[in-house]
C-alpha cells in the first residue's frame, strides 16, 4: 500500500509538471501572437513614429515571453539562469533594431551563476529591455557604434544580487535625476525596482552605468542561489 501511495504521488507530480510546462509554452506562444499582430499593424501603418512605438512594445513582449520559453525548457520549471536570459533579450533587441553585424558589441559576464524565478525574472528582463533600448537609441548618436556590457554577480556577503549595466556612449544628460524623470523608460525601471525590493543607481563617466541590486534567497536544491520571493 505504501508503494502504491508513492506511485500515485509521483504520477500526480508528473501530471502537474506536464501541465505547468504546457502553461509556460502556451503563454509564450500567445505573447508571440500578440507581437506578430503588432508587426502587422506596423506594416500597414507605414508611419515611422508608429513603427518606433510598436517596435518598443514588441521588445517588451519578447522580454516577458523569453522567460516562459526558458522555463518551458528547464528541468525544474521554477528558475532560469539570469545571464542566459539577459543575453537572449539583448540579442533580440539588437536584431529588432536591424543593427549591422558588429555595430553594437553586446556581452554578458557572470562573476557567479545566478538564477531567477518568474516573479523576479520578468521585472529584471523589462528593466534590461529599457536600458538596452535607450543605449541603442541615445548613447551612440554620432557613429551608431558602441559597446554594452552587463556584469552579473553578488555582493560580498552573498545576500544581494547585482547587475552592473554599462554602455560606452555619451553618458547621461547634465542634471539627470532619475527620481524626477517622467519618461516611460525611467518610470518603468523605478517601479520595477521597487517591485523586486531592489535599489538602482545611475552614473555618468565614459558612458552610462546603471547598477541594480536586489535580495537573494537560499534554496536547498542544486542551484546555489535563486533570486525571488519566498514561497
Per-range role (PLM):
Residues 1-13, 17-20, 24, 31, ...:
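Amphipathic, heptad-repeat alpha-helical coiled-coil "signal-transmission/dimerization" linkers
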Residues 55-62, 66, 79-96, 151-153:
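Short beta-to-alpha transition helix within the HATPase_c
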Residues 145-158:
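Short beta-strand/loop element within the Bergerat-fold HATPase_c
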Residues 151, 164-166, 208-218:
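Short C-terminal beta-strand
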Residues 158-186:
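Glycine-rich/acidic phosphate-handling loop/turn and adjacent ATP-lid/helix
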Residues 175-203, 229-231:
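ATP phosphate-binding glycine-rich loop and adjacent ATP-lid/helix-beta elements
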Amino acid at each position: 500500500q505504501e508503494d502504491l501511495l508513492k506511485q500515485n504521488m509521483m504520477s500526480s507530480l508528473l501530471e502537474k509538471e506536464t501541465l505547468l510546462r504546457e502553461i509556460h509554452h502556451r503563454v509564450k506562444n500567445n505573447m508571440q501572437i500578440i507581437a506578430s499582430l503588432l508587426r502587422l499593424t506596423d506594416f500597414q501603418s507605414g508611419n515611422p513614429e508608429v513603427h518606433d512605438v510598436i517596435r518598443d512594445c514588441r521588445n517588451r513582449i519578447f522580454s516577458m515571453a523569453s522567460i516562459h520559453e526558458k522555463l518551458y525548457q528547464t528541468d525544474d520549471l521554477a528558475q532560469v539562469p539570469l545571464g542566459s536570459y539577459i543575453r537572449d533579450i539583448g540579442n533580440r533587441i539588437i536584431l529588432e533594431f536591424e543593427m549591422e553585424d558588429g555595430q553594437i558589441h553586446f556581452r554578458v559576464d557572470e562573476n557567479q551563476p545566478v538564477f531567477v524565478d518568474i516573479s523576479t525574472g520578468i521585472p529584471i528582463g523589462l528593466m534590461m529591455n529599457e536600458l538596452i533600448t535607450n543605449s541603442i537609441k541615445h548613447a551612440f548618436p554620432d557613429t551608431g557604434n558602441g559597446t554594452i556590457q552587463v556584469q552579473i554577480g553578488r555582493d560580498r556577503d552573498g545576500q544581494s544580487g547585482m547587475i552592473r549595466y554599462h554602455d560606452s556612449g555619451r553618458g547621461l544628460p547634465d542634471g539627470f535625476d532619475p527620481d524626477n524623470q517622467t519618461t516611460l523608460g525611467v518610470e518603468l525601471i523605478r517601479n520595477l525596482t521597487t517591485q523586486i525590493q531592489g535599489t538602482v543607481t545611475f552614473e555618468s563617466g565614459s558612458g552610462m552605468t546603471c547598477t541594480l541590486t536586489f535580495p537573494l534567497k537560499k534554496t536547498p536544491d542544486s542551484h546555489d542561489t535563486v533570486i525571488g520571493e519566498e514561497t
